Amino acid sequence: MTLTPRTLTAEFLGTALLLAVVVGSGVMGETLAGGNVAIALLGNTIATGAILVVLILIFGPISGAHFNPAVTLSAVLQGEMRSRDAVAYALTQMVGAVAGVFLAHGMFDLEILQVGVNVRTGPGQWLAEGVAAFGLVLTIIGCVRKAPGAVPYAVGLYITAGYWFTASTSFANPAVTIARALTETFSG
C-alpha cells in the first residue's frame, strides 16, 4: 500500500467510525438492556461485527482497511508495507480511534473527555488479546490468499465471535484498546 493523504484519510475515517460504533452501540445496548449485561454485550457485538464488514468494503480498496496497528505490523512483516509508512498508519489509527470515542460521546450527549474505569488487565486479559490478535491476522492472511472477497465478512464474523470467546471481549487492536480507555461507558 502506498502512503498518500487519501490512504491516511481512509484509515482515520475507518478507525474513527469503528470506535464510534463500538462505544455508541455499547451505550445504546446498556441503555436498552435494562441491566442485562449479556443483552448489552450482544447488541455491542452485532453492531461491531456488522460495521467492520461495511468499513472494510468501503475503505479496503483505498487503504487496505487496516484500522489496527497489529494488522499494519503484519503487512510490514509480510513485505507489503514499508516500516516508515506503517508508523504513519498506526499514528493515524490511534488518532482516529480517539476521535471515534469522542464522536460517540458527542452523539449521546456525554462528556467528551472521560477516563475509563473498567479494569482490563492481568494475565488472562493479555492472553486473550494475544489470541484475538493472532486469530484476526490469521483470518486476514488466510482469506487474502484463498478468497480475498471474503475478507470483510470473515473479519466481521471473527470479531463477533471473539467478543464471546475471549476474556477481553476481543479488542484484538491496540488502537481500540487505547481509545477505549478514554470512555467511562459500557465499552470502556
Predicted regions and their residues:
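Membrane-interface helix-loop junctions and terminal tails of multi-pass membrane proteins
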Residues: 1-188
